[in-house]
Amino acid sequence: MKALHFGAGNIGRGFIGKLLADAGIQLTFADVNQVVLDALNARHSYQVHVVGETEQVDTVSGVNAVSSIGDDVVDLIAQVDLVTTAVGPVVLERIAPAIAKGLVKRKEQGNESPLNIIACENMVRGTTQLKGHVMNALPEDAKAWVEEHVGFVDSAVDRIVPPSASATNDPLEVTVETFSEWIVDKTQFKGALPNIPGMELTDNLMAFVERKLFTLNTGHAITAYLGKLAGHQTIRDAILDEKIRAVVKGAMEESGAVLIKRYGFDADKHAAYIQKILGRFENPYLKDDVERVGRQPLRKLSAGDRLIKPLLGTLEYSLPHKNLIQGIAGAMHFRSEDDPQAQELAALIADKGPQAALAQISGLDANSEVVSEAVTAYKAMQ
Protein backbone atom coordinates (compact mmCIF):
# COMPACT_ATOMS: atom_id res chain seq x y z
CA MET A 1 0.00 0.00 0.00
CA LYS A 2 1.27 3.48 -0.90
CA ALA A 3 0.40 6.69 0.92
CA LEU A 4 1.09 10.38 0.45
CA HIS A 5 0.98 12.59 3.54
CA PHE A 6 0.72 16.38 3.23
CA GLY A 7 2.51 18.13 6.09
CA ALA A 8 5.91 16.95 7.34
CA GLY A 9 5.69 19.06 10.50
CA ASN A 10 5.72 17.69 14.03
CA ILE A 11 2.19 16.25 13.85
CA GLY A 12 2.76 14.77 10.40
CA ARG A 13 5.99 13.06 11.40
CA GLY A 14 5.13 12.28 15.03
CA PHE A 15 1.57 11.04 14.63
CA ILE A 16 -0.05 10.19 11.28
CA GLY A 17 3.16 9.60 9.33
CA LYS A 18 4.49 7.39 12.11
CA LEU A 19 1.31 5.27 12.22
CA LEU A 20 1.36 4.80 8.45
CA ALA A 21 5.07 3.92 8.31
CA ASP A 22 4.75 1.60 11.34
CA ALA A 23 1.98 -0.23 9.44
CA GLY A 24 4.43 -1.02 6.64
CA ILE A 25 2.86 1.44 4.20
CA GLN A 26 5.19 2.97 1.61
CA LEU A 27 5.05 6.61 2.74
CA THR A 28 5.99 9.86 1.04
CA PHE A 29 5.69 13.21 2.83
CA ALA A 30 4.78 16.38 0.91
CA ASP A 31 5.80 19.73 2.37
CA VAL A 32 7.13 23.20 1.48
CA ASN A 33 9.96 23.19 4.05
CA GLN A 34 13.07 22.44 1.98
CA VAL A 35 15.26 21.75 5.03
CA VAL A 36 12.88 19.00 6.18
CA LEU A 37 12.47 17.61 2.64
CA ASP A 38 16.24 17.42 2.12
CA ALA A 39 16.77 15.74 5.51
CA LEU A 40 14.04 13.15 4.85
CA ASN A 41 15.42 12.33 1.40
CA ALA A 42 19.00 12.11 2.68
CA ARG A 43 18.17 9.77 5.58
CA HIS A 44 14.77 8.22 4.79
CA SER A 45 14.27 7.94 8.56
CA TYR A 46 13.82 10.01 11.72
CA GLN A 47 13.46 9.60 15.47
CA VAL A 48 10.31 10.03 17.54
CA HIS A 49 10.52 10.46 21.33
CA VAL A 50 7.37 8.90 22.81
CA VAL A 51 6.84 10.23 26.33
CA GLY A 52 4.44 9.28 29.11
CA GLU A 53 5.28 7.53 32.38
CA THR A 54 8.57 6.70 30.68
CA GLU A 55 10.39 7.86 27.56
CA GLN A 56 11.23 5.70 24.57
CA VAL A 57 12.77 6.54 21.20
CA ASP A 58 11.24 4.99 18.07
CA THR A 59 12.83 5.15 14.63
CA VAL A 60 10.53 5.66 11.65
CA SER A 61 12.21 4.40 8.49
CA GLY A 62 11.64 3.86 4.77
CA VAL A 63 10.09 7.29 4.13
CA ASN A 64 10.54 9.71 1.22
CA ALA A 65 9.57 13.33 0.62
CA VAL A 66 8.50 15.62 -2.23
CA SER A 67 7.67 19.30 -2.51
CA SER A 68 3.94 19.91 -2.13
CA ILE A 69 4.05 22.56 -4.86
CA GLY A 70 5.84 20.64 -7.65
CA ASP A 71 4.85 18.09 -10.29
CA ASP A 72 6.05 15.14 -8.18
CA VAL A 73 3.12 15.48 -5.78
CA VAL A 74 0.65 15.48 -8.70
CA ASP A 75 2.24 12.29 -10.08
CA LEU A 76 2.00 10.60 -6.68
CA ILE A 77 -1.70 11.39 -6.25
CA ALA A 78 -2.28 9.58 -9.54
CA GLN A 79 -0.63 6.44 -8.09
CA VAL A 80 -1.15 6.11 -4.32
CA ASP A 81 -3.92 4.32 -2.39
CA LEU A 82 -4.20 6.81 0.47
CA VAL A 83 -3.71 10.57 0.91
CA THR A 84 -3.60 12.05 4.42
CA THR A 85 -3.04 15.60 5.67
CA ALA A 86 -1.82 17.34 8.82
CA VAL A 87 -1.30 20.86 7.54
CA GLY A 88 -3.60 22.96 9.74
CA PRO A 89 -7.18 23.99 8.88
CA VAL A 90 -6.27 27.12 6.91
CA VAL A 91 -3.81 25.29 4.62
CA LEU A 92 -6.35 22.74 3.32
CA GLU A 93 -7.56 25.21 0.70
CA ARG A 94 -3.98 25.76 -0.48
CA ILE A 95 -3.26 22.07 -1.13
CA ALA A 96 -6.60 21.43 -2.88
CA PRO A 97 -5.44 22.55 -6.38
CA ALA A 98 -2.53 20.06 -6.33
CA ILE A 99 -4.88 17.28 -5.20
CA ALA A 100 -7.33 18.20 -7.97
CA LYS A 101 -4.54 18.08 -10.59
CA GLY A 102 -3.45 14.68 -9.29
CA LEU A 103 -7.00 13.35 -9.48
CA VAL A 104 -7.35 14.56 -13.09
CA LYS A 105 -4.07 12.81 -13.94
CA ARG A 106 -5.30 9.65 -12.19
CA LYS A 107 -8.44 9.72 -14.34
CA GLU A 108 -6.44 10.34 -17.53
CA GLN A 109 -4.17 7.40 -16.72
CA GLY A 110 -7.20 5.16 -16.27
CA ASN A 111 -6.33 4.36 -12.63
CA GLU A 112 -9.70 3.30 -11.22
CA SER A 113 -8.38 1.64 -8.07
CA PRO A 114 -10.00 3.33 -5.06
CA LEU A 115 -8.24 6.29 -3.47
CA ASN A 116 -9.16 7.51 0.00
CA ILE A 117 -8.30 10.97 1.29
CA ILE A 118 -8.29 11.67 5.04
CA ALA A 119 -7.69 15.15 6.49
CA CYS A 120 -6.29 14.69 10.01
CA GLU A 121 -6.87 18.20 11.29
CA ASN A 122 -8.03 19.80 14.51
CA MET A 123 -11.44 20.61 13.08
CA VAL A 124 -14.88 19.10 12.64
CA ARG A 125 -15.33 17.16 9.37
CA GLY A 126 -12.14 18.60 7.89
CA THR A 127 -12.11 16.16 4.97
CA THR A 128 -15.59 17.28 3.92
CA GLN A 129 -14.26 20.85 3.82
CA LEU A 130 -11.18 19.72 1.87
CA LYS A 131 -13.49 17.92 -0.59
CA GLY A 132 -15.34 21.19 -1.21
CA HIS A 133 -12.04 22.94 -2.06
CA VAL A 134 -10.94 20.05 -4.31
CA MET A 135 -14.28 19.95 -6.13
CA ASN A 136 -14.05 23.71 -6.75
CA ALA A 137 -10.62 23.19 -8.31
CA LEU A 138 -11.71 20.28 -10.56
CA PRO A 139 -12.86 20.68 -14.16
CA GLU A 140 -16.55 19.80 -14.60
CA ASP A 141 -15.81 16.67 -16.63
CA ALA A 142 -13.79 15.12 -13.77
CA LYS A 143 -16.25 15.61 -10.92
CA ALA A 144 -18.46 12.56 -11.46
CA TRP A 145 -15.38 10.33 -11.86
CA VAL A 146 -13.92 11.63 -8.58
CA GLU A 147 -17.24 11.06 -6.77
CA GLU A 148 -17.20 7.44 -7.98
CA HIS A 149 -13.56 6.51 -7.32
CA VAL A 150 -12.33 8.75 -4.48
CA GLY A 151 -13.42 8.49 -0.85
CA PHE A 152 -13.23 11.64 1.27
CA VAL A 153 -13.09 10.22 4.78
CA ASP A 154 -13.64 12.43 7.84
CA SER A 155 -11.63 11.74 10.96
CA ALA A 156 -11.03 12.79 14.55
CA VAL A 157 -7.41 12.96 15.69
CA ASP A 158 -5.93 13.34 19.14
CA ARG A 159 -2.28 13.41 20.15
CA ILE A 160 -0.38 16.22 21.84
CA VAL A 161 2.71 17.06 19.78
CA PRO A 162 4.43 20.15 21.19
CA PRO A 163 6.98 22.12 19.15
CA SER A 164 10.32 20.35 19.38
CA ALA A 165 12.80 21.70 21.91
CA SER A 166 15.41 19.31 20.54
CA ALA A 167 18.88 19.88 21.93
CA THR A 168 20.33 18.20 18.84
CA ASN A 169 19.01 20.79 16.34
CA ASP A 170 17.83 17.84 14.27
CA PRO A 171 15.05 19.16 11.98
CA LEU A 172 13.37 15.74 11.96
CA GLU A 173 13.43 14.75 15.62
CA VAL A 174 10.03 15.05 17.29
CA THR A 175 8.48 14.44 20.72
CA VAL A 176 4.94 13.06 21.15
CA GLU A 177 2.86 11.83 24.07
CA THR A 178 2.12 8.10 24.44
CA PHE A 179 -1.63 8.61 23.96
CA SER A 180 -2.94 8.74 20.42
CA GLU A 181 -6.39 8.43 18.88
CA TRP A 182 -7.24 8.42 15.16
CA ILE A 183 -10.91 7.67 14.54
CA VAL A 184 -12.23 7.58 10.96
CA ASP A 185 -15.71 7.43 9.44
CA LYS A 186 -15.89 3.96 7.91
CA THR A 187 -19.04 4.83 5.96
CA GLN A 188 -17.08 7.17 3.65
CA PHE A 189 -14.38 4.82 2.31
CA LYS A 190 -14.20 3.63 -1.28
CA GLY A 191 -13.13 -0.01 -1.68
CA ALA A 192 -11.98 -2.27 1.15
CA LEU A 193 -11.58 -0.81 4.64
CA PRO A 194 -7.88 -0.41 5.49
CA ASN A 195 -6.32 -2.30 8.40
CA ILE A 196 -3.90 0.18 9.96
CA PRO A 197 -2.97 -0.32 13.64
CA GLY A 198 -3.85 2.87 15.50
CA MET A 199 -6.66 3.79 13.09
CA GLU A 200 -10.08 3.16 14.63
CA LEU A 201 -13.13 2.74 12.39
CA THR A 202 -16.58 4.00 13.44
CA ASP A 203 -20.00 4.64 11.93
CA ASN A 204 -20.73 7.32 14.55
CA LEU A 205 -17.87 9.76 14.00
CA MET A 206 -19.60 12.91 15.28
CA ALA A 207 -19.89 11.44 18.77
CA PHE A 208 -16.10 11.03 18.88
CA VAL A 209 -15.39 14.34 17.13
CA GLU A 210 -17.45 16.17 19.75
CA ARG A 211 -16.07 14.07 22.62
CA LYS A 212 -12.56 15.17 21.68
CA LEU A 213 -13.53 18.78 20.88
CA PHE A 214 -15.59 19.18 24.08
CA THR A 215 -13.01 17.53 26.35
CA LEU A 216 -9.41 17.63 25.13
CA ASN A 217 -9.72 20.84 23.07
CA THR A 218 -12.01 22.64 25.52
CA GLY A 219 -9.84 21.69 28.49
CA HIS A 220 -6.57 22.48 26.70
CA ALA A 221 -7.76 25.94 25.63
CA ILE A 222 -9.13 26.89 29.05
CA THR A 223 -5.92 25.68 30.73
CA ALA A 224 -3.94 27.89 28.34
CA TYR A 225 -6.08 31.01 28.76
CA LEU A 226 -6.35 30.86 32.54
CA GLY A 227 -2.70 29.77 32.77
CA LYS A 228 -1.51 32.77 30.79
CA LEU A 229 -3.59 35.13 32.91
CA ALA A 230 -2.05 33.61 36.05
CA GLY A 231 1.48 33.99 34.66
CA HIS A 232 2.19 30.30 34.00
CA GLN A 233 4.51 29.31 31.16
CA THR A 234 3.39 25.77 30.33
CA ILE A 235 0.19 23.70 30.30
CA ARG A 236 1.69 21.48 33.03
CA ASP A 237 2.39 24.49 35.29
CA ALA A 238 -1.14 25.77 34.71
CA ILE A 239 -2.98 22.49 35.38
CA LEU A 240 -1.00 21.97 38.60
CA ASP A 241 -2.48 25.29 39.83
CA GLU A 242 -5.44 24.05 41.89
CA LYS A 243 -7.68 27.04 41.06
CA ILE A 244 -7.18 26.56 37.33
CA ARG A 245 -7.50 22.77 37.57
CA ALA A 246 -10.89 23.11 39.31
CA VAL A 247 -12.26 25.32 36.51
CA VAL A 248 -10.82 23.14 33.73
CA LYS A 249 -12.16 19.93 35.27
CA GLY A 250 -15.51 21.64 35.91
CA ALA A 251 -15.72 22.85 32.30
CA MET A 252 -14.97 19.36 30.96
CA GLU A 253 -17.66 17.94 33.25
CA GLU A 254 -20.14 20.55 31.98
CA SER A 255 -19.36 19.78 28.34
CA GLY A 256 -19.38 16.07 29.24
CA ALA A 257 -22.94 16.34 30.52
CA VAL A 258 -23.90 17.57 27.03
CA LEU A 259 -22.14 14.60 25.39
CA ILE A 260 -23.81 12.11 27.74
CA LYS A 261 -27.22 13.62 26.95
CA ARG A 262 -26.59 13.88 23.20
CA TYR A 263 -24.80 10.62 22.42
CA GLY A 264 -25.47 8.36 25.39
CA PHE A 265 -21.84 8.08 26.49
CA ASP A 266 -21.42 6.11 29.71
CA ALA A 267 -21.03 8.62 32.59
CA ASP A 268 -18.37 6.61 34.48
CA LYS A 269 -16.33 5.99 31.33
CA HIS A 270 -16.53 9.67 30.43
CA ALA A 271 -15.37 10.66 33.93
CA ALA A 272 -12.37 8.33 33.42
CA TYR A 273 -11.71 9.94 30.01
CA ILE A 274 -11.63 13.38 31.70
CA GLN A 275 -9.16 12.09 34.31
CA LYS A 276 -6.96 10.67 31.54
CA ILE A 277 -6.92 14.06 29.81
CA LEU A 278 -6.00 15.88 33.02
CA GLY A 279 -3.12 13.39 33.34
CA ARG A 280 -2.01 14.18 29.79
CA PHE A 281 -1.92 17.91 30.59
CA GLU A 282 0.36 17.10 33.56
CA ASN A 283 2.87 15.15 31.43
CA PRO A 284 6.29 16.42 32.62
CA TYR A 285 7.91 15.55 29.30
CA LEU A 286 5.61 17.83 27.28
CA LYS A 287 6.84 21.42 27.47
CA ASP A 288 3.65 22.78 25.92
CA ASP A 289 3.59 26.57 26.01
CA VAL A 290 0.32 28.24 27.06
CA GLU A 291 0.79 30.89 24.39
CA ARG A 292 1.06 28.27 21.62
CA VAL A 293 -2.05 26.41 22.82
CA GLY A 294 -4.05 29.63 23.21
CA ARG A 295 -3.31 31.13 19.82
CA GLN A 296 -6.07 31.92 17.29
CA PRO A 297 -8.63 32.98 19.93
CA LEU A 298 -11.10 34.25 17.29
CA ARG A 299 -11.33 30.75 15.80
CA LYS A 300 -11.53 29.17 19.25
CA LEU A 301 -14.35 31.54 20.25
CA SER A 302 -16.35 30.89 17.06
CA ALA A 303 -19.75 29.17 17.16
CA GLY A 304 -18.61 25.70 16.08
CA ASP A 305 -15.46 25.50 18.14
CA ARG A 306 -14.27 24.28 21.55
CA LEU A 307 -15.70 26.98 23.84
CA ILE A 308 -18.99 28.14 22.34
CA LYS A 309 -20.20 24.82 20.92
CA PRO A 310 -20.29 23.05 24.31
CA LEU A 311 -21.83 26.19 25.85
CA LEU A 312 -24.62 26.04 23.24
CA GLY A 313 -25.14 22.39 24.22
CA THR A 314 -25.62 23.37 27.87
CA LEU A 315 -28.25 25.90 26.77
CA GLU A 316 -29.96 23.29 24.57
CA TYR A 317 -30.30 20.85 27.47
CA SER A 318 -30.66 23.44 30.29
CA LEU A 319 -27.41 22.34 31.96
CA PRO A 320 -24.96 24.33 34.12
CA HIS A 321 -22.05 26.14 32.42
CA LYS A 322 -20.34 28.44 34.96
CA ASN A 323 -16.87 26.97 34.31
CA LEU A 324 -17.24 27.16 30.53
CA ILE A 325 -18.11 30.85 31.03
CA GLN A 326 -14.84 31.31 32.96
CA GLY A 327 -12.97 29.75 30.03
CA ILE A 328 -14.68 32.05 27.52
CA ALA A 329 -13.84 35.09 29.66
CA GLY A 330 -10.22 33.90 29.86
CA ALA A 331 -10.07 33.57 26.07
CA MET A 332 -11.28 37.16 25.70
CA HIS A 333 -8.24 38.26 27.73
CA PHE A 334 -5.73 36.38 25.53
CA ARG A 335 -2.95 38.66 24.30
CA SER A 336 0.07 37.65 22.23
CA GLU A 337 2.45 39.79 20.19
CA ASP A 338 3.00 36.84 17.84
CA ASP A 339 -0.66 36.08 17.10
CA PRO A 340 -2.59 38.33 14.68
CA GLN A 341 -5.92 36.94 15.97
CA ALA A 342 -5.04 37.94 19.54
CA GLN A 343 -4.33 41.47 18.32
CA GLU A 344 -7.56 41.55 16.32
CA LEU A 345 -9.48 40.35 19.39
CA ALA A 346 -7.96 43.09 21.56
CA ALA A 347 -8.78 45.74 18.94
CA LEU A 348 -12.36 44.49 18.62
CA ILE A 349 -12.93 44.61 22.39
CA ALA A 350 -11.34 48.08 22.60
CA ASP A 351 -13.52 49.31 19.73
CA LYS A 352 -16.89 47.71 20.52
CA GLY A 353 -16.67 46.70 24.16
CA PRO A 354 -16.67 43.10 25.41
CA GLN A 355 -20.41 42.51 24.98
CA ALA A 356 -20.67 43.41 21.28
CA ALA A 357 -17.25 41.91 20.52
CA LEU A 358 -18.13 38.51 22.01
CA ALA A 359 -21.49 38.50 20.21
CA GLN A 360 -19.79 39.26 16.89
CA ILE A 361 -17.09 36.58 17.29
CA SER A 362 -19.29 33.82 18.72
CA GLY A 363 -22.63 34.41 17.06
CA LEU A 364 -24.28 34.55 20.50
CA ASP A 365 -27.07 37.09 21.05
CA ALA A 366 -25.49 40.24 22.52
CA ASN A 367 -28.49 40.64 24.85
CA SER A 368 -28.52 37.03 26.04
CA GLU A 369 -27.95 36.00 29.63
CA VAL A 370 -24.84 33.96 28.74
CA VAL A 371 -23.12 36.91 27.07
CA SER A 372 -23.92 38.97 30.16
CA GLU A 373 -22.43 36.20 32.37
CA ALA A 374 -19.29 36.06 30.20
CA VAL A 375 -18.83 39.84 30.27
CA THR A 376 -19.23 39.87 34.07
CA ALA A 377 -16.61 37.11 34.36
CA TYR A 378 -14.34 38.95 31.87
CA LYS A 379 -14.50 42.18 33.89
CA ALA A 380 -13.84 40.30 37.13
CA MET A 381 -10.56 39.04 35.63
CA GLN A 382 -9.26 42.54 34.82
UniProtKB/Swiss-Prot annotation:
InterPro entries the UniProt entry points to: 6-PGluconate_DH-like_C_sf, 6PGD_dom2, Mannitol_1_phos_5_DH, Mannitol_DH, Mannitol_DH_C, Mannitol_DH_CS, Mannitol_DH_N, NAD(P)-bd_dom_sf
Family according to the record: Belongs to the mannitol dehydrogenase family.
Highest taxon of the lineage: Bacteria
Entry keyword annotation includes NAD: yes
EC number: 1.1.1.17
GO CC aspect terms: cytosol
Membrane spanning residue stretches: none
Keywords associated with the record: Acetylation, NAD, Oxidoreductase
Keyword Repeat recorded: no
Modification N6-acetyllysine occurs at: 269
The species this protein was found in: Shigella flexneri
GO biological process assignments: mannitol catabolic process
Catalysed reaction equations from the record: D-mannitol 1-phosphate + NAD(+) = beta-D-fructose 6-phosphate + NADH + H(+)
Name of the protein in its database record: Mannitol-1-phosphate 5-dehydrogenase
Single annotated GO MF: mannitol-1-phosphate 5-dehydrogenase activity
